């Protein structure tokens, strides 16, 4: 799509973050809200929002960078999918050197505490937060 303004602006992700496993969240009707929330809570940088051609109020695809990694999301569901329950069985882990700053910013933006940010038996400071979309985030500050 050479005429796409998001691509024409040069607002493309660093190829280094486009490797490995990339989480892709389906947030039925809430992807734009999540996109903005992740900028406030986790300092996310935007690499593009692409509306659904049939329903321009919904995002077909959105892409951000958080802490050097890529996160993708959509408002759309495949026709065979039903509305998803709160995500379970995984979390998104942020490994950082300044855990207190990440923790404070996420709480101020609206995350709730699942586990407090404390020193763990393996030596790291670690926590678990839940964002308003039901996604659990762990902040890990490795022991020095």
Q: Which stretches of residues belong to each language-model region?
A:
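Core segments of cupin and vicinal oxygen chelate
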Residues: 15-17, 25-71
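Vicinal oxygen chelate
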Residues: 1-19, 51, 60, 65, ...
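Short beta-strand-to-loop junctions in surface cap/lid or active-site-entrance loops
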Residues: 29, 76-77
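A structural signal for short, well-ordered beta-strand segments
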Residues: 23-25, 90-94
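GST-like domain detector, emphasizing the conserved glutathione-binding G-site
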Residues: 84-88
